[in-house]
Amino acid sequence: TGYSICYELGIFKQKIVDGQQVELPDNWLGLGDAWLIPKMDEVEEVRFGGTVEDDWDSQGRHQIKHTGYDTVLAVPRDMEIAGYKTEHGNTLRLWDAKSPTPVDMSLFSSGQYLKAVEQKAMAESISKVLYPEDNHYEGKSLRLKQQYFFVSATIQSIVRKHRAEYGTLRNFHLKHVIQINDTHPTLAIPELMRILLDEEGYSWDEAWYITTHTIAYTNHTVMAEALERWPQQLIERWLPRIWQILKEISGRYQDALTTYFHGDLSKVAPMAIIWGGEVRMANLCVCACFKVNGVSALHSEILKKDVFHDAYVRTPDKFTNVTNGIDHRRWLAESNPKLDALIQECCGKDKYLLKPEALKELEKFQDDAGVLTRLGEIKAANKKAFAAWVQRESGIVLNTDAMFDVQVKRLHEYKRQLLNVLHIIYLYQKLKADPHFDFTPRTYLFGAKAAPGYAVAKRIIRLINSVADMIAKDPICKDRLQVVFLENYRVSLAEKLMPASELSEQISTAGKEASGTGNMKFMMNGAVTIGTLDGANVEMHQVLGDENIFLFGLKAHEVAEMKEKGYKSYEYYVHNPELRAVVDQLNVGFGDGVTYEDIARRLLFGDGGMADEYLLLADFESYRDAHVRAGLAYRDPKRWNKMALMNIARSGIFAADRSIRDYARDIWNVPVRTIK
């Protein structure tokens, strides 16, 4: 069973106005919720605020009195999900936040209508919006409430069902694994402890044993700012009993660390759970979970060697890797029916749908001119279909004769959409200087949402649109260079775009991307990757070889070494005249009255931090050279189609089926039934 919150609204619907992102409500439930079945007999109560008093009964047993709290009801809404040709289905349980009191009748009767429904509004705000902005106190409070609401309802539900079946929780850890997906559900740890201690009467040691043999943690990021830290005052205010338990866990863990590291605070402090008035959720996971896994081989090594190094030294058996995977039945068979038909013809009907490793059978067609030609025809047809959709939606006419060069993902500096833009500016400048400049025509497609409070990311979106407008207005670029920002990037758009894509931009700074799954979706649909050795790109390269991927840039250890020695982006600017011209163009602007001195300054001098933190200028020349190689390969359709076919053939290892088998074998310790 999977658990989450039944959000009414998604993160936001993106609108581009004058080149800038504007956030509008994205009404998820308004699309219809007929498949969500409310289970009113399984409603859970979640408590916020109030005060906690310690008490002891006549036999000296510790008891907790929690008073003055606010109650929010968690209403489960279940979606049943059928498997493909299996005898089983799974349940996705989404919790809907409701107030136990729809209206305060005494206030309503006295004419205080807004005040009368305030409690209802506050309760329902918990399941209102996915990822509310949290750069202010109210936003942080709401995020914390969302996380505790979600885990408290979930843990209570699991415990209730287990108790009904077995009559005891002593075997709880033998019947359940609770997989924490990133740090957002980390409060499941103290919540399970709370139930075992306060409601079931277990001793601390008994409760801790059950908890630490039940919960496992998947880490999804090495970015320090994404490893959640909560102000302790916030937890004290809204979750007083959870705070008490966290303090006890933290104190015991810190004592154990102090003993293990012989009082070395330089080791203890970074691993502490509560330190400097903050509660560090990732450290809590590493302390309490029986397994910690990264989501690509490189990512898991970085966790062991850097992010959680001392924890790894202390408990090496706790750490493992499970590389991410994607649902090939959705992202290939359903999204790309023409390609699915060709694969079924070559590999034996729907064999690959049950066994994605069967895609490897395509390799025997790598020199089959007929199959390669058909593969090229399918890609061309998908490009035309996508272009027709874009024209209907936006009025923009895509050049389908050019290579579709695609970068679609969350807008973040480490993902380096800006590096892509700098290269586009370079191409434009070369075209302006020499209209006969020889390069392979490109249609660049971007799709990205920036977090509402992430100012730099929003500026990069505006920059992309400024460059796109300049190129669209310049006749010299006609049929040679085009840039389009696809508004409101989302799953339904991705399902149309992936089958039409030809070059997949996976260009994050090496060592920063945990895994990525977009890279796998592109690969499975026959797009060739241009990328760094980062995240799952490393494993893609291992199965593809140098000949089927365009690699560039510094490796993760080289990035670390360069930063340690003192990276000076300005030297690259000074010594490379073409790069200098590109950066200088940011200061001048792109003909729409908007300049980007702030971005140029950030690259050359920093903006209160390190200049060019993600090493765009260091990787620029290597990136440009990789694009030249990609362009030359694209001009040879037979070679390109062979590369595309090899990408599809070797993508089976990145199917979610393999990923789930790895979790089942290495973490959950459950048998996997082989489908014949």
Locate predicted features:
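A conserved ligand/cofactor-binding region detector
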Residues: 1-676
